[in-house]
Amino acid sequence: MIKVQEYRGHIRNWEELCERLGISLLLPRKEREEEILVKAYETWGYEMADHMHGMFAFALWDEENNQLFCLRDPFGTKPFYYYETEDGTLLYGTTIRKIMEQPGFKKELNEEMLQLYLSLTYVAGENTFFRGLKKLMPGRYLIWKDGDRKSVV
């Protein structure tokens, strides 16, 4: 069973995907888009982003394979962050605040990123102002299986 754990965004080609995946066009937007995510993952797996157009970031829990699949749209319009705690727990979300509020998050300033920001006036790459907190880069996905980051592709 696939469960949507986190979702933020809008799928622009939802009508086409509903027809291809056998989803009712009459569902409310939130329910419809979550159903699209589940069916697209079941149908295309990690290649699901190749079929979706829009701005989105999400996390799906694949109960059968005991893994979390996180994906960010190719343009990076919607953010997605992740953080591994000292005990190996993955914290994730579409806002930094959500992650900061969870047990195990350490608020440690990433001084290197602050220095880069003050020099370049933007934050480049996957690092953030908090040590250990990473951005999932645009068009990339993260697989977390059995308490271990398997890949960021």
Task: State each model region's role.
Residues 1-153:
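Cysteine-centered catalytic environments shared across enzyme families
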